[in-house]
């Protein structure tokens, strides 16, 4: 009886081992097929993509994108970050007046852009004053210009 049981156990172990080995071999085969399939499919896909693209397509695409972006951009003034006449200014780099305009201060770093500064306004340079005369940080009358009343 013992020998029969031993034979049965031996048969079962053999059958189980053979099933496991076939499972492993089928798993390996499936993995190899997947790897081979993906490599060939990938290379075919790359070949198809490169066949469809011509040399002239890329520069035209880039050129049209640049043109559309340029059309969407606002016109940039000659000086960046400058204010036009009548706008807020502060006599700083970030809020300065454009061109020959001058910032007429009304308070501490608070002013508006004007053509030139009137008499008794704060100035640094003579060119900022309408009279072209800046003394002691104030625009002064020009003694050489006389206003003749009618």
Curated annotation (Swiss-Prot):
Primary localization: secreted
Transmembrane domains' residue ranges: none
Superkingdom of origin organism: Eukaryota
Disulfide bond positions: 116-130, 123-134, 129-139
Similarity comment: Belongs to the UPF0506 family.
UniProt note: domains: The presence of a 'disulfide through disulfide knot' structurally defines this protein as a knottin.
Protein name: UPF0506 protein SJCHGC02380
